[in-house]
Amino acid sequence: MALKRLLILAALLVGGSGLAVGQAGIEPSVLDKLKRLFPAATTFSPKEGEPLHFTAYAADARGARTALGYAFWTTEVVPLERGYGGPIVMLVGLDMKGVISGIVVGDHREPYGNFSIDMPQFAAQFRNKDIRDPFKLGEDVDAVSRATITMSSAVRSTW
């Protein structure tokens, strides 16, 4: 009986630790989002620096790491942007040249529907935009019909 308890405890400690924390202290749900922004990355740093950011790395055959870019939560870089239903939190990836590799909408309370910021075409509009270029809603990014406040907030928090 004591052996059974010990095995259950060991299984919980070993198996459960992977549920709570992913690579280098990064939560698995965040790690999944980072991999969507940098599919070629083999590792990611924990949040560090000022402003707080993750660094995406690729490793070559010898194991040498090369930085691919950075990812940051918009709420940790710019003042809190509020949409129609509240804050909009996005994870933004930037390559080493200052070009957006992608965005992942994290948390929001905006209305859902055919023209939601959760739709893949919303995030796709930001990909390959250079952060040094002017950026305007309606020109660089299409607005979501009937969601002016949501879109304005999303664009301001990314740019």
Question: Each predicted region: which residue ranges?
Answer:
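Bacterial N-terminal signal peptides that target proteins for export
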Residues: 1-7
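A composition-driven signal for long, intrinsically disordered, charge-rich low-complexity tracts
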Residues: 4, 20-21
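Bacterial N-terminal signal peptides
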Residues: 8-17
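Flexible, solvent-exposed loop/hinge segments and secondary-structure transition points
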Residues: 21-144, 148-152, 158-159
